[in-house]
């Protein structure tokens, strides 16, 4: 995905995050995406990030008005703050900074620092990248400091939500007994759920 990126600044930023920073890259590959909600297992963060990036890649092919490089690269690093928000396994619990600041702001701070290290990084693009990070939960009540104001930020928040819900559903169904059609009430989905009949 990074190799297909045409924008030199976004490509440089992705390489700084995932290739040059070997410690971060190693942690990112084995970290969970959550404590318990979705992808809360070893490698869950990488799996979730790649899934969101693939969804965004498909959005970009369906909707040519989306900037492919911006949405796919932002999808790859949208949850990078989780590496510091959550402790490593076996604890997989919130750190003090994670509790007080949260992964969205932590990720945006790290992105800002890395962007400043890239000579000539366009200020408008820098703001668009940071906005996608800050708005990726879509709504203020879901923890986003900003509501999406760019098409790419809207699409990213939808892709993130879709992948989280699909994984949550799969994890619930995996725990169901073979002969049990319906789950109990699921607070995270605000409903009971069942598998399709075919």
Residue ranges and their predicted role:
Residues 1-5, 16-17, 132, 158, ...:
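Residues that form generic nucleotide/phosphate-binding pockets
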Residues 157, 182-187, 196-198:
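N-terminal intrinsically disordered, cationic/polar leader segments
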Residues 58-176:
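Divalent metal-dependent catalytic cores for phosphoryl transfer on phosphate-bearing substrates
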Residues 22, 176-179:
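Generic detection of intrinsically disordered/low-complexity segments and helix-coil linkers/edges
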Residues 136-138, 178-187:
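Short, mixed-charge aromatic SLiMs
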Residues 1-98, 139:
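Acidic/His-rich, divalent-metal-binding segments that scaffold phosphate/diphosphate chemistry
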Residues 10-11, 21, 126-127, 152, ...:
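Alpha-helix initiation and N-capping motif
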